[in-house]
Amino acid sequence: MKELSLNGAVVQTYPLTAAQRIHFYTVSACRREELLNIATGFYIEFADVDFNTLRACIRDGYEKFESMRLRFTKDEDGNLVQYLVPTEDREIKLVDFSHWREEDAHEEMKRWSRIPLHMDGSPMSEIVMIRLPGNFNGLYMKVHHMTMDSTAIMSFYSYVLNLYCYKKFENIEAPKLPKSYLAQLKLDLKYEDNSPALERDRKFWLEQLEAPEPIYTPFSPRNRLLELREQTGNPNLRACYGTGDIEADIKVYELEDAPSKALIAFSKEYRIPVASILLLGLRTVFSHFSGNEKDVSVKNAVARRGTLLESQSGGTRIHFWPLRTVIEPETSFLDALKIVQAKENALLRHANYDPIRYMGETAAHYGCPQGTGYECTTLTYQPVSAASLKGRQLPDMNFKSMWYSNGVAMQLIYVTVMHRPTDNGFSFHFEYEKNSVSLDEIEKLYYYLCRAIFRGIEDPNRTIGEILDWM
């Protein structure tokens, strides 16, 4: 931690955390800063929104959420550091799209989403109040991923919306105040300073490298590992490149209401997290596309929001970890879920370790070519639904939420599963490199993912081998 003089003012600066370094490493590799934009919209069917009050609530949100006032700059040694500004005084404008076609309005906001936020002391967010056709009104928000992740964004929306309701309606409780980002940041930096917890986590991850080398399994019938083996003349290669042309888009599939409810009911009945079911579904598909390979790895996004301070302090906390399982074909679906869940729990206990450091340790240990890896995709499951933002406050109003593509991706395909605001069903978002991955590949991935999951849910005693045979 160092003091830095900026524009005549002395500010306290802090190093980047491991979670922030993941994003900085990625954007440094592709040199497209818009990669780290997260752009979302939240709109309520309510014609009489008081935008002056809403603007005041947004300003209050900026004041209360410290990570919304983060800035980045380089210190005298050339290292990127972070610091807080005391206030956020920028204009919060209102844009009226009410006379546009709604799809054109969303296209315009998608264009905004591809304008980068620069890490040069500039603001790391942009919020615009929006009027949409059909009396839908709300917010468009673009934030930098090194300041906020999806959990933090949902918390910010919740705070602003609940504060607005508290000010405008009767019998509404004031929102709970968020925790301090700086307090959690100092704990994270203390962990990284050769703490005993860090040593325990390092020991765990180095033990994972004692296993034989993993193998890349594909997300579609096109096996890119076999293609790379042929190109390099190395039939023993087990790792593959995970990116191509980085221009990206998002394809969304909506799981119908009945199967969504069946998945949630199964999760509750057997006390298996939805994330574990999704992970098993994905690894089963990857096994299918690789000739029923038993050894499958999926990269899992771990939120690291276990404590009250972690869950309510904003910021970006996601670490990405390989979830590797070896599942025999005679294993039942339910037992396979328990294997995945146990592996997930082990990762969670040691998720604070630096993923970038572990990537380097993995590459050095197995000798895989630079830029290659063993996981064909990353899964993010967002258990907090947009419906939870307004359930107690505005139960009788329709609303919609949007996730706008920033146009860039550093992975061939990235799977995000979230809950629909209308009925709490599941939306499957496939962010994909559109010049490297075909829509046919995505369609097959979604089709077989649903097939694998619901074959298992229908009869948890079915074996993985039987499910693979039916695929």
For the regions a language model picked out, list residue spans one by one.
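Gly/Ser/Thr-rich phosphate-binding loops and adjoining beta-strand/alpha-helix segments
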Residues: 3-16, 33-53, 119-141, 229-307, ...
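His-Asp-centered acyl/peptidyl-transfer active-site segments
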Residues: 9-10, 29-38, 66-68, 74, ...
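Acyl-thioester-dependent condensation/acyltransferase catalytic cores
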Residues: 58, 62-141, 147-151, 158, ...
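A short, small/polar-residue-rich loop/turn motif at beta-strand boundaries
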Residues: 2-11, 15, 47-63, 79-122, ...
